[in-house]
């Protein structure tokens, strides 16, 4: 472990008398990772020169690198039923259908705990080439890779229509959810 960015003061906005509120800070994090971000609240004590730090939230396995959208049909969705040895890597993360980042692993288009969504598979997905792509690209660039899953096996082209296709609109929603 090493400190990349030291403790940084944030602007805070207290919303009510229960001290519930928000804080905002902009950090310049160098490409790479995985990083961990810790937050805490510093308060003054009644004893001079003594402060208390209250635990805040912690974000684990944060990578700053390249993002790719997985969109398309069978291969993108993982319809290969072949057995393969393709273990996960800490350098490749996947924005899963449940709208959470996770370490990328097969099956990549699984929908456990997902809300109803356009690209939910009816069958059990298998192996996708995109984990191997992410690992290879990450090794070539030396940077983490994030994959955003939006594919659906056997989907017709009209569902990808930018004007009103539900799969296209789902893809745009996922891009917005991840900060794009």
Q: Where in this protein do the model-derived segments appear?
A:
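Cell-envelope and extracellular/periplasmic
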Residues: 1-180
């Amino acid at each position: 472990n090493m400190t990349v960015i030291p403790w940084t003061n944030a602007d805070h906005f207290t919303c009510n008398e229960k001290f519930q509120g928000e804080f905002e800070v902009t950090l310049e994090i160098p490409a790479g990772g995985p990083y961990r971000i810790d937050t805490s609240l510093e308060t003054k004590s009644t004893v001079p020169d003594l402060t208390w730090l209250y635990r805040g939230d912690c974000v684990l396995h944060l990578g700053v690198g390249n993002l790719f959208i997985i969109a398309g049909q069978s291969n993108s969705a993982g319809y290969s039923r072949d057995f393969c040895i393709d273990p996960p890597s800490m350098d490749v993360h996947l924005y899963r259908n449940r709208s959470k980042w996770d370490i990328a692993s097969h099956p990549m288009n699984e929908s456990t705990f997902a809300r109803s969504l356009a690209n939910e598979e009816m069958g059990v997905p298998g192996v996708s080439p995109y984990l191997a792509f992410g690992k290879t690209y990450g090794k070539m660039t030396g940077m983490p890779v994030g994959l955003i899953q939006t594919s659906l096996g056997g989907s017709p082209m009209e569902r990808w229509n930018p004007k009103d296709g539900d799969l296209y609109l789902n893809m745009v929603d996922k891009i917005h959810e991840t900060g794009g």
